[in-house]
């Protein structure tokens, strides 16, 4: 009896030590982006066959992906963890390569816009660039003399639902005020937008909800948080309703997680993200035949990197950037849908069980 008690006590002590060691390892994983940059990025970038500019563009995405799985990564040895993170970076790069040619603004593509009713841009800021590429625009903005906020919100959602149902290539552009919970300018919660997309795409009997033909762009405060909530809710409601989910939409956020958006203020407020889209793909010549997702995650992202940062110049070369005002950094986010094969590959990299739940969308920088 005494031997049994001693054995039980010893096992319990070992278990407590193992738990303590696991907690200590998890606590060592960088929990903020600056620490990730300082502690892990030098070794990661050294192992990747890439340029400093390219690593800079995927670095925030890699950090957030690692942060989502920090406990799992923290249980690995230093070498194992570094190898796993490098594989995650390579996975992000493969998804960038595979999705980069997706057209966002182009010929015969429908464009649906929603503009802030008060000091937001005029419809021409979307219609002009759309028609310049042969796209077909419909823009909603409240006429305060004749329309209510709710009426315009209903009209916008009806157009989005129709686009989801018809399956024609469509880009939806929302410019205004936002929060993690809603498109504030028109009081549209992420749950209502999720239901609109599901109800539209779910009208095809016996077929899964497929939103691969839709690109959703939000240029407002907390847009990445809003789109994460939207994507997560679409997944959850499809499960609740026993609907298959073929694909989520591509989702583009003008601001990263927990970030406000910035704008140039005058008679109208001009969001920095969409301002740079107009500058790069409408004002500058020659124009491309179409504007692709790669144009967004390479060119727009690169242009916006200068907000809140100052270039470090040696001779005629920009060798890096110095952080000046973190509050001005928006660092746009580009979410792409993941297939079952993608999810299986991620689980393998992370050492997760084959049935471990993972989001069906990925931030690719």
What is each PLM-predicted segment?
Residues 2-12:
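Bacterial N-terminal signal peptides that target proteins for export
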Residues 214-350:
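Active-site-proximal C-terminal subdomain of hydrolase catalytic domains
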Residues 27-33:
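Cleaved targeting-peptide boundary
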Residues 334, 350, 357-363:
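Glycine-rich, flexible loop motifs
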Residues 11-23:
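Bacterial N-terminal signal peptides
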Residues 24-27, 101-103, 110-112, 362-365:
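Non-Sec secretion/translocation targeting segments of pathogen effectors
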Residues 37-40, 47-220:
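A domain-level signal for caspase-like cysteine endopeptidase catalytic cores
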């Amino acid at each position: 009896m005494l031997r049994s008690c001693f054995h039980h006590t010893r096992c319990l002590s070992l278990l407590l030590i193992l738990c303590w060691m696991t907690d200590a390892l998890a606590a060592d994983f960088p929990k903020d982006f600056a620490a990730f940059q300082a502690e892990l990025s030098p070794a990661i970038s050294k192992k990747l066959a890439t340029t400093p500019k390219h690593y800079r563009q995927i670095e925030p995405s890699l950090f957030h992906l690692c942060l989502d799985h920090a406990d799992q990564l923290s249980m690995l040895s230093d070498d194992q963890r570094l190898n796993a993170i490098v594989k995650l970076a390579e996975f992000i790069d493969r998804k960038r390569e595979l999705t980069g040619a997706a057209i966002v603004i182009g010929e015969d593509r429908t464009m649906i816009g929603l503009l802030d009713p008060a000091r937001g841009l005029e419809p021409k800021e979307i219609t002009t660039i759309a028609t310049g590429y042969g796209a077909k625009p419909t823009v909603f903005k409240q006429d305060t003399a004749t329309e209510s906020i709710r009426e315009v919100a209903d009209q916008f959602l009806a157009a989005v639902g129709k686009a989801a149902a018809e399956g024609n290539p469509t880009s939806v552009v929302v410019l205004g005020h936002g929060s993690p919970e809603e498109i504030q300018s028109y009081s549209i919660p992420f749950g209502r937008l999720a239901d609109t997309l599901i109800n539209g795409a779910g009208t095809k009997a016996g077929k899964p909800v497929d939103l691969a033909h839709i690109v959703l762009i939000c240029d407002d405060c907390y847009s990445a948080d809003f789109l994460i909530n939207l994507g997560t809710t679409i997944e959850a409601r499809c499960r609740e309703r026993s609907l298959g989910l073929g694909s989520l939409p591509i989702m583009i956020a003008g601001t990263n997680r927990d970030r406000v958006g910035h704008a140039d203020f005058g008679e109208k407020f001009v969001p920095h993200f969409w301002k740079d889209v107009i500058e790069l793909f409408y004002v500058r010549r020659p124009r491309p035949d179409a504007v692709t997702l790669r144009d967004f995650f390479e060119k727009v992202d690169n242009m916006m990197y200068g907000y809140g940062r100052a270039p470090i110049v040696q001779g005629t070369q920009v060798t890096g950037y110095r952080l000046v005002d973190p509050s001005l950094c928006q660092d746009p986010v580009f979410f792409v849908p993941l297939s079952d094969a993608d999810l299986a590959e991620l689980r393998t990299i992370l050492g997760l069980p084959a049935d471990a739940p993972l989001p069906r969308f990925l931030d690719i920088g």
